[in-house]
């Protein structure tokens, strides 16, 4: 059974859970060779299945109740990817939207439909691999 946990950006447990993934060359390559970052302004949503991290969404909290989803990762494809990403997004939306936050996301084009199911809308900004969305 997949469990989603929430950790603050400087939580020691976050580093223990994510280090094997964020230092893996395949995972870094999947992130367009961009390093994963965190700070005290981040909240991380981590999907765990049988003690294995199978995905995560970092959310950076900015001023004015604006939050940004960027550099998320899901270790699956097709239907399993949709399932994991949906669980993660559900946790993020449940935590932020009722509290009055605006969510912006730099979304992989392949995941656009999943974000739309959670009422994210595309903005005019679009790159080769990503689309900017908000809710």
Please provide the spans of the model-predicted regions.
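Conserved acetyl-CoA binding element of GNAT-fold acetyltransferases
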Residues: 65-77, 128
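Active-site beta-strand termini and strand-to-loop segments that position acidic
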Residues: 48-50, 132-135
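Conserved active-site alpha-helix within GNAT-family acetyltransferase domains
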Residues: 108-127
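Conserved beta-strand in the GNAT
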Residues: 46, 51-61, 68
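Conserved acetyl-CoA-binding loop-helix of GNAT-fold acetyltransferases
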Residues: 80-94
């Amino acid at each position: 059974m997949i469990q989603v946990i929430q950790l603050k950006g400087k939580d020691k447990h976050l580093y223990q859970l994510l280090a094997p993934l964020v230092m893996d060359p395949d995972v870094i390559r999947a992130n367009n060779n961009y390093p994963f970052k965190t700070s005290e302004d981040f909240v991380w949503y981590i999907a765990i299945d049988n003690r294995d991290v199978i995905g995560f969404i970092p959310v950076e909290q900015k001023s004015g109740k604006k939050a940004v989803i960027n550099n998320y990762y899901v270790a699956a494809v097709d239907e399993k990817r949709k399932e994991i990403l949906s669980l993660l997004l559900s946790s993020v939306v449940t935590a932020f939207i009722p509290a009055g936050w605006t969510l912006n996301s730099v979304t992989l084009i392949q995941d656009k439909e999943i974000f739309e199911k959670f009422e994210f809308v595309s903005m005019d900004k679009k790159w080769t691999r990503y689309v900017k969305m908000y809710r």
